[in-house]
Amino acid sequence: GKDSLSPRDQLTLEIARMLREDFLQQNAFMDVDSYSSFDRQLRLLALILHYEDLCRDAIAKNVELPALFAIPARERLGWAKYAAAEEYAANYQQVHDEMDSEIAALIEKAGEDA
């Protein structure tokens, strides 16, 4: 199963799932998600790809994959698409900054444990 894959391959599967569920999947019953501007879509995609880059760097520095998937900013990323139109830019930036700090803390902890 999935557990037999390398951490990098498991991350690829997780990013693919995020792209499918957090980026491509829409909820037509929610006004904020039934239509998104190009800028909003671009920023959300950039946020997911930034998470992937941070995770790949962290994996190279011996951070465990479950810890990367469990950061609070990861869950907030999944809910970011539901931010109101006038708030999404600030919301996305906040999630971006939280991802940076939370993953940096995991990298620092992995360095101390090594």
Specify the residue positions occupied by each region the protein language model found:
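Conserved catalytic/coupling modules of large nucleotide/cofactor-utilizing molecular machines
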Residues: K2-A114
